[in-house]
Amino acid sequence: MELFKHFLQSTASDVFVSPVSISAVLAVLLEGAKGRTAAQLRLALEPRYSHLDKVTVASRVYGDWRLDIKPKFMQAVRDRFELVNFNHSPEKIKDDINRWVAARTNNKILNAVNSISPDTKLLIVAAIYFEVAWRNQFVPDFTIEGEFWVTKDVSKTVRMMTLSDDFRFVDVRNEGIKMIELPYEYGYSMLVIIPDDLEQVERHLSLMKVISWLKMSTLRYVHLSFPKFKMETSYTLNEALATSGVTDIFAHPNFEDMTDDKNVAVSDIFHKAYIEVTEFGTTAASCTYGCVTDFGGTMDPVVLKVNKPFIFIIKHDDTFSLLFLGRVTSPNY
């Protein structure tokens, strides 16, 4: 969540990240880290997701032949390790990596790696793929053109999907948010948070706050209008990780369990993600006080038009594992 908040506060445009993919890379680094370096990585790691159905997570380690890698690290990553010569054939290795990523994301992530320096000693790649249908699917014939307010004064025409059904919904008026849970098949769901004041809600957003809103939600009959969208994002994670407390890997790290080479440090960590939300589903390569309106007895249907910037979270329902986090300010399809 902290990495996500970093990007929310550093850009006004759309944001999309996968904590799962980021954690897969950090987990490989942790296998070779000791001391403070290892402690920082542990604090930043999300839980492991390998047991989740319909989620494909894969990682691969490319080590240069010049790097003296310890047997302990080799044993830990043995099924994912490939010995290469970055100095001799960086272009070929780049193409091999891009083919590997494309194959594991159903060709949704292409050209994941733009270039590789001949001086590279170790390169770690992680890929995630998620494709699940809505439990209650939108009907394409009911998708219409609608207005989406990018700002208070500027709007654009988008493809607005419509559906009337029972959803978990909450209107937390004293915090200025509405939230709806859109269920997928196989025990996943998307939480859509529609803030009155986007910047204010983003500043105070936390996992515990989201959980508290969900606990306040009730099953309501909702007339929902929701924009169809897709986006692809690309980030360098160095600064975001540093603000989350992961600093040592970039300067003077302790990778004692990986190698005796004291000059090995992480130069950059890149992250690329893709999501597509349609009528059929999604493809994507605490206790807090709240005033919730209680209508009592039979409640009137809710009319919810998601026609302004919103935050979304794709989660595993049983574990509340966060697979993807995003903000949509200007939907495109």
Swiss-Prot record:
Stretches that traverse the bilayer: none
Family, per the entry?
Answer: Belongs to the serpin family. Poxviruses subfamily.
Function comment? Weak inhibitor of the interleukin-1-beta converting enzyme (ICE) and of granzyme B. Does not form a stable complex with ICE, but can for a stable complex with granzyme B.
Task: Give GO terms: molecular function aspect only.
Answer: serine-type endopeptidase inhibitor activity
What CDD domains does the record point to? Answer: serpin (cd00172)
Q: What is the lineage of its organism?
A: Viruses, Varidnaviria, Bamfordvirae, Nucleocytoviricota, Pokkesviricetes
Fetch the Gene3D superfamilies from UniProt: Alpha-1-antitrypsin, domain 1 (2.30.39.10), Antithrombin, subunit I, domain 2 (3.30.497.10)
Q: What is its main location?
A: host cell
Q: Where in the cell is it found?
A: Host cytoplasm
Organism (species): Myxoma virus (strain Lausanne) (MYXV)
The cross-references to InterPro entries, in alphabetical order and at most eight, read: Serpin_CS, Serpin_dom, Serpin_fam, Serpin_sf, Serpin_sf_1, Serpin_sf_2
Q: Where is this site: Reactive bond?
A: 294-295
User: What's this protein's name?
Assistant: Serine proteinase inhibitor 2
Instruction: Tell me where on the tree of life, at the top rank, the source sits.
Output: Viruses
Cellular-component GO terms for this entry: extracellular space; host cell cytoplasm
Q: Which Pfam families does the UniProt entry name for this protein?
A: Serpin
Q: Which GO terms describe its biological process?
A: symbiont-mediated suppression of host apoptosis
- Swiss-Prot/TrEMBL keywords: Host cytoplasm, Host-virus interaction, Inhibition of host caspases by virus, Modulation of host cell apoptosis by virus, Protease inhibitor, Serine protease inhibitor
Which SMART domains did the record assign? SERPIN
